[in-house]
């Protein structure tokens, strides 16, 4: 796909992956409209950290996915939609599950309907590897069963199925990308790698939840390239595409690796309040990299 001059809407643009995607699209000379959630501070989230020359080339619009009028206005005259906006954070989904359904399912429905009525070249919907639950087999391919092991995962499964239904029912050119765990600059301090690094540098020990879960970790710029390749590939329409490396590491191994790189002999301790409920824990997520992604290039490295 030729991105120069392409009119692109990015929801969730003020978030971690979204801000990197916006930055990359600007570098490719796309005409980027960034949807951010309204706040009284006129704060663009992580877009505020982009270079000034990049920010000057972004059209920022404030709105709310749960308002259908807001999604309609945001999508006007756009060719491509990258839908990344969602309520994330598994712990809070145990506290406010209805809010997760309202935003992740209801908000996605509003955007899909606006895209259907206005017509877009491509709608890239963002899922999550959490929809797989604990792996029934590894590596996990796109046909792996989906399991709602948390209200967050359940809300994303619902959103994924809505996206699928709009492809099958209305021929909306949807592709669903399912990133595994992504890391890199601008990531939330609550994420596992920043959490370990911060404690390794400042604490007397490194306190974590369970050390056993294994995750497939992908650098954020690679994840962004996966988004762009999925949007550009016609064979990806109607498909779910995993974005992962095919390698996993346990949280304990990850902490030991970071401590070795930083230096020091700090103890790694587990704290129960950091753990998920046992039946809600996802013990292993490791992506298959030889599935449908081969037809359109997959991750760059």
Feature annotation, model-predicted:
Residues 1-182:
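N-terminal Rossmann-like NAD(P)+-binding domain of SDR-like oxidoreductases, especially those catalyzing
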Residues 23-30, 34, 63, 194, ...:
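C-terminal substrate-binding subdomain of Rossmann-fold SDR/epimerase-dehydratase oxidoreductases
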Residues 37, 44-47, 136-138, 187-190, ...:
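Short aromatic-enriched loop/helix-cap "lid" or pocket-rim segments at secondary-structure transitions
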Residues 54, 136, 185-189, 247, ...:
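Residue-level signature of the cytosolic catalytic core of signaling kinases
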Residues 69-72, 91, 98, 109, ...:
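Residues in well-ordered alpha-helical elements
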Residues 110, 181, 187, 213-215:
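Heptad-repeat alpha-helical coiled-coil signaling segments
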Residues 158, 162, 166, 196, ...:
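Hydrophobic alpha-helix immediately C-terminal to the catalytic Tyr-X-X-X-Lys motif of short-chain
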């Amino acid at each position: 796909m030729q991105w120069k001059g392409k009119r692109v809407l990015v929801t969730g643009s003020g978030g971690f992956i979204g801000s990197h995607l916006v930055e990359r699209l600007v570098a490719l000379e796309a005409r980027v409209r960034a949807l951010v959630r309204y706040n009284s501070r006129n704060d663009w989230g992580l877009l505020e950290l982009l270079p000034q020359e990049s920010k000057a080339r972004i059209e920022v619009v404030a709105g709310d996915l749960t308002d259908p009028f807001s999604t309609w206005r945001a999508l006007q005259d756009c060719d491509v939609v990258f839908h990344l906006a969602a309520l994330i954070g598994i712990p809070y989904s145990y506290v406010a599950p209805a809010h997760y359904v309202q935003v992740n399912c209801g908000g996605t429905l509003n955007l899909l309907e606006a895209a259907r009525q206005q017509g877009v070249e491509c709608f890239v919907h963002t899922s999550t590897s959490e929809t797989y639950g604990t792996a029934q087999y590894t590596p996990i391919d796109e046909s792996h069963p989906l399991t709602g092991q948390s209200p967050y995962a359940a809300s994303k499964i619902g959103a994924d199925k809505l996206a699928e239904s709009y492809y099958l029912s209305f021929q909306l050119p949807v592709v669903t990308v399912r990133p595994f765990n992504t890391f890199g600059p601008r990531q939330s301090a609550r994420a596992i790698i920043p959490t370990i690094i911060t404690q390794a540098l400042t604490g007397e020990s490194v306190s974590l939840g369970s050390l056993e879960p294994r995750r497939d970790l992908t650098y954020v710029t690679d994840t962004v390239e996966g988004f762009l390749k999925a949007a550009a590939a016609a064979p990806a329409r109607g498909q779910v595409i995993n974005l992962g490396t095919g390698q996993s590491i346990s949280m304990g191994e990850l902490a030991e690796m970071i401590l070795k790189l930083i230096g020091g002999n700090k103890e790694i301790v587990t704290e129960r309040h950091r753990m998920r409920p046992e039946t809600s824990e996802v013990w292993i997520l490791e992506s298959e990299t030889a599935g449908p992604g081969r037809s359109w290039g997959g991750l760059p490295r």
